[in-house]
Amino acid sequence: MLQARIEEKQKEYELICKLRDSSNDMVQQIETLAAKLETLTDGSEAVATVLNNWPSIFESIQIASQHSGALVRIPPSTSNTNASATEQGDVEEV
């Protein structure tokens, strides 16, 4: 009778060990899933930022296509009045 009880407890112990191992595997899978979800969240934020920029891009394209003039750089000169303008990279509309 005592031997049967010991065998029963050993089987119970083996099952508990399997349950512990399964629980550890589950914890690792959940942690991996959490990391993947974090990556997905970061990617979603990047996509949202890009999508939020499109109206500005379209507006810039529209403004550029409506503008008939061209922008050119002012050539450098030796006079002091033009030197400060060219150092700052000013442009002149033609």
UniProtKB/Swiss-Prot annotation:
Residues 76-87 have a biased composition (Polar residues). Signal peptide: none annotated. Its main location: nucleus. InterPro entries: DASH_Dad2 (IPR013963). The keyword Cytoplasm applies. GO terms for cellular component: condensed chromosome, centromeric region; cytosol; DASH complex; kinetochore; microtubule; mitotic spindle midzone; mitotic spindle pole body; nucleus. Component of the DASH complex that connects microtubules with kinetochores and couples microtubule depolymerisation to chromosome movement; it is involved in retrieving kinetochores to the spindle poles before their re-orientation on the spindle in early mitosis and allows microtubule depolymerization to pull chromosomes apart and resist detachment during anaphase. This is DASH complex subunit dad2. The lineage of its organism: Eukaryota, Fungi, Dikarya, Ascomycota, Taphrinomycotina.
